Regions:
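Short alpha-helical DNA-recognition segment
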Residues: 16-33
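DNA major-groove recognition helix of helix-turn-helix/homeodomain DNA-binding modules
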Residues: 44-64
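Short polybasic/polar patches that bind polyanions
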Residues: 12, 23, 55
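A short, Lys/Arg-rich alpha-helix, primarily the initiator
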Residues: 1-13, 51, 61
Length: 64
């Protein structure tokens, strides 16, 4: 699953806005928005932070 889809999926499962996810990841709303639209790709550090956030919140991606 591409990172864009993972971001949208995680937000849906946790019922979070882009702003709320951004706050949890330590980035801006605009950054999450660009990631989800595919206009930017998270750095490795932010990708690891997102993966940790998902693990802590028990978000599981099928077919990972």
């Amino acid at each position: 699953m591409p990172i864009q889809e993972k971001l949208v999926f995680a937000r849906a499962v946790l019922n979070l806005s882009q702003q709320e996810l951004a706050k949890n990841l330590g980035v801006s709303f605009a950054t999450v928005n660009r990631w989800e639209k595919g206009h930017a790709i998270p750095s490795k550090r932010h990708e690891i932070c997102f993966e940790r956030f998902c693990k802590e919140n028990k978000v599981v991606f099928d077919g990972k």
